[in-house]
Every structure is written in structure tokens, then in C-alpha cells.
Amino acid sequence: MSVNDGVDQMGAEPDIMEFVEQMGGYFESRSLTRLAGRLLGWLLVCDPERQSSEELATALAASSGGISTNARMLIQFGFIERLAVAGDRRTYFRLRPNAFAAGERERIRAMAELQDLADVGLRALGDAPPQRSRRLREMRDLLAYMENVVSDALGRYSQRTGEDD
């Protein structure tokens, strides 16, 4: 029996569900929700690649509210997208094309926002002694460095693969 035979959790291959559970454990170990990891794991391997909220709830033995909440989180992180199908009132989700590159681009945006917040903090400190502003400067400088490094790496990856977001 293969994943193509349906989205029923009991019908999925044990190795597939083991992978899905490992993704959940990985996310949980990173202080995210286990269900978000399982949802991402399932969308990495399911067929068809587009899954309704109901199909996801069945496949993952999860509540529709849990699917909705965790799908919103994964959308915010840039990994998945919501789809509308003409004539169908259900909500569908799928992995975004180049999902992990998109996720890294979202992380770059978050780094830029945190740099801006560090600048707000530095302005608020005004003429405070340098030892008081040191932590904010370190935060801003590291984030600026990481933003450049990750941006450059994504650019090289896109050139190498010939793919864009």
C-alpha cells in the first residue's frame, strides 16, 4: 500500500508515517509544535501534493483547529501556501515551490525587522554609556552579518539550480 492509496493515516506506509513523526519530533525539539512538524512532513511526501484541511486532519489524526493553527504558522514561516480551487469551498494547502529557500527568505526578512528593532533600542538609549548599548549593537551587527551571508548563499543556490523562489 502506498501514500497514493489515500490520506488515511492507517493506509500510509509505516516508513512514511515514521518520517512524519520524526519531523514532528524535530519541530518539537526546536520549541515549535509537534503538529507543525508533522504537517510539514506530510506535505513533503503526500500524494496528491495538494491536501484539504479535512484530508490533513485525517492523515495526521489531528483536529481541524490544530491543522488551521499550524498551517497558519507554516504559511508565516514561508513553507506552505493556501490554495483555492474553483468550485470547491474547501481550503487546500501544499508545500510552496522551493519551500525551504522561501523559508530562508522569510528568515532574512525577520532578521531585517530585528535589526530595525535593535536600532530603535539604540536610539532609545541615546547617549548611554557604550557598555549599556553593547548588547543591542552585538544583536544588530550579527543579524546584519547573517542577513548578508544567508542572502548570498541563497543567490548562489538559485544560480546553481537555475530556480527562483
From Swiss-Prot:
Residues 53-76 bind DNA. Residues 1-151 form the HTH marR-type domain. It comes from Mycobacterium tuberculosis (strain ATCC 25618 / H37Rv). The gene is mmpR5. InterPro entries: HTH-GbsR_regulator, WH-like_DNA-bd_sf, WH_DNA-bd_sf. Controls the expression level of the Mmps2-MmpL2, MmpS4-MmpL4, and MmpS5-MmpL5 transport systems. Also controls its own expression. Acts by binding directly to the promoter regions. Gene3D superfamilies: HR1 repeat, Winged helix-like DNA-binding domain superfamily/Winged helix DNA-binding domain. GO terms for molecular function: DNA binding. Induction: Negatively autoregulated. Homodimer. Disruption phenotype: Mutations or insertions/deletions that inactivate MmpR5, or decrease its activity, lead to increased levels of MmpL5 and MmpS5, and to non-target based resistance to azoles, clofazimine and bedaquiline. The keyword Nucleotidyltransferase does not apply. PANTHER family: HTH-TYPE TRANSCRIPTIONAL REGULATOR MJ1563-RELATED, HTH-TYPE TRANSCRIPTIONAL REGULATOR MMPR5. Keywords: DNA-binding, Repressor, Transcription, Transcription regulation. This is HTH-type transcriptional regulator MmpR5.
